[in-house]
Swiss-Prot record:
It comes from the Bacteria. It comes from Clostridium novyi (strain NT). PANTHER family: UPF0297 PROTEIN YRZL (PTHR40067:SF1). NCBIfam families: PRK05473.1. This is UPF0297 protein NT01CX_2279. Belongs to the UPF0297 family. InterPro entries: IreB.
Length: 84
């Protein structure tokens, strides 16, 4: 067994961004599967903070509540403005 002599670097921001993207994708899929317009529902949630805009289906409401709304907006703006 060889020992890696290189220092590993942990990027907390990248991991947070990946988690946010993953949760948004899962919530999006759950909303679509239930017949909702995901954009309208997510906008309603982001504006009001009311989690009932997000379906309970597949645990989507619990997932979205793991994120702060400002984190979601940050990720959406990064994607929209193509800033990585």
């Amino acid at each position: 067994m060889s020992i890696n002599e290189n220092t590993m670097e942990f990027d907390i921001q990248k991991n947070k961004d990946d988690l946010t993207r993953s949760i948004l994708s899962e919530v999006n899929n759950s909303l679509k599967e239930k017949g909702y317009n995901p954009i309208n529902q997510l906008v309603g949630y982001l504006i009001s903070g009311d989690p009932t805009y997000i379906t309970n289906y597949n645990g989507a409401r619990a997932l979205i509540r793991k994120l702060e709304r400002d984190e979601i907006l940050e990720e959406v703006l990064k994607a929209y403005l193509s800033i990585k």
